[in-house]
Amino acid sequence: MISESIDTYRYLGKYIVSCQEKNGAIAWEPSSKIDPWDHVESAMGLDVLGFEDNSKKAYKWLVDSQESDGSWFSEYKKEKVTKFRKETNFAAYIATGAWHHYINFENKKFLQDLWPTIQKSINFVLEGQTIDGDILWAKDKSNEWMDDSLLTGCSSIYKLSLIHI
């Protein structure tokens, strides 16, 4: 039986906060790169550890940095885009994070406020779905869909692998 309380792990939340920039973005390490997937993972860590205000700042960054097509670029450094790919699994993951935040804080207003951003991100993901049902991995720097679908089940996106014999 585990006897530690959540307070035992608050130092981890403090570390995540040390990686958070003023605009709410959470880097891999202080002053390091930012990607939307790990950013959401970090926000969920903040949720579990009780850092609600910092988590909300993280989601605000997602709202503020979302592209008009509902996506995010795959990598940022400070406020500059460093990788221009737009990945479907990154776009979909905000929905998972938002639900996680709700489970921790039961804040319906948070979900309502975030809903337009989630809806745009899911629409982006669905635009990448092929006739076979798989979801293309990403758009490239030219904003064209890449002809590739991931086999991973990440972000609760089902991606089908077609085997051609």
Describe the residue ranges of each PLM region.
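Low-complexity, Ser/Thr/Pro/Gly-enriched N-terminal "stalk/linker" regions
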Residues: 1-37, 48-72, 76, 125-132
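Extended ligand-binding clefts on enzyme/binding-domain cores
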Residues: 2-4, 10-11, 32, 112-116, ...
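Carbohydrate-binding/catalytic loop surfaces
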Residues: 23-41, 49, 71-93, 97, ...
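Residue-level signal for cytosolic alpha-helical hairpin/rod architecture
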Residues: 39-40, 158-161
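Conserved small/polar residues in nucleotide/adenosyl-binding loops
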Residues: 163-165
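Helix-terminus loop motifs that line ligand-binding clefts
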Residues: 50-122, 126-129
